Amino acid sequence: MSRKMTGIVKTFDGKSGKGLITPSDGRIDVQLHVSALNLRDAEEITTGLRVEFCRINGLRGPSAANVYLS
């Protein structure tokens, strides 16, 4: 089950395409992968940006899906 949320990009490594989002509701950080972004936002993603995303339960903990810049 996914849940729509907002948060701030805590870290993002353009080489690996991985990072973390800190959710606005104070829950634990959510894993971010470049494949969860639309193509336009993937070029602009950087630390400190506010994003909207769906939180899903991945094999390695909470992950972000359908990530958009807000």
UniProtKB/Swiss-Prot annotation:
Transmembrane segments: none annotated. It is found in: Cytoplasm. InterPro entries: Cold_shock_CspA (IPR012156), CSD (IPR011129), CSD_CS (IPR019844), CSP_DNA-bd (IPR002059), NA-bd_OB-fold (IPR012340). GO terms for biological process: regulation of gene expression. It comes from Escherichia coli (strain K12). GO terms for molecular function: DNA binding; nucleic acid binding. It comes from the Bacteria. It holds the Pfam family CSD. The keyword Acetylation does not apply. This is Cold shock-like protein CspF. GO terms for cellular component: cytosol. Keywords: Activator, Cytoplasm, DNA-binding, Transcription, Transcription regulation. Residues 7-67 form the CSD domain. Its main location: cytoplasm.
